[in-house]
């Protein structure tokens, strides 16, 4: 795995995590 792939994976993980935090926040968690 090269640095470009690792960068894209970290960006996708961070994006998915932030979306789930927003969804949980709206649900009252």
Swiss-Prot record:
It is found in: Cellular thylakoid membrane. One of its GO terms (molecular function) is electron transporter, transferring electrons within cytochrome b6/f complex of photosystem II activity. Keywords: Electron transport, Membrane, Photosynthesis, Thylakoid, Transmembrane, Transmembrane helix, Transport. It is a single-pass membrane protein. The chain crosses the membrane at residues 3-23. GO terms for biological process: cytochrome complex assembly; photosynthesis. GO terms for cellular component: cytochrome b6f complex; plasma membrane-derived thylakoid membrane. Component of the cytochrome b6-f complex, which mediates electron transfer between photosystem II (PSII) and photosystem I (PSI), cyclic electron flow around PSI, and state transitions. The 4 large subunits of the cytochrome b6-f complex are cytochrome b6, subunit IV (17 kDa polypeptide, PetD), cytochrome f and the Rieske protein, while the 4 small subunits are PetG, PetL, PetM and PetN. The complex functions as a dimer. Belongs to the PetN family. This is Cytochrome b6-f complex subunit 8.
């Amino acid at each position: 795995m090269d640095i470009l792939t690792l960068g894209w994976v970290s960006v996708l993980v961070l994006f998915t995590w932030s979306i789930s935090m927003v969804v949980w926040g709206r649900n009252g968690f």
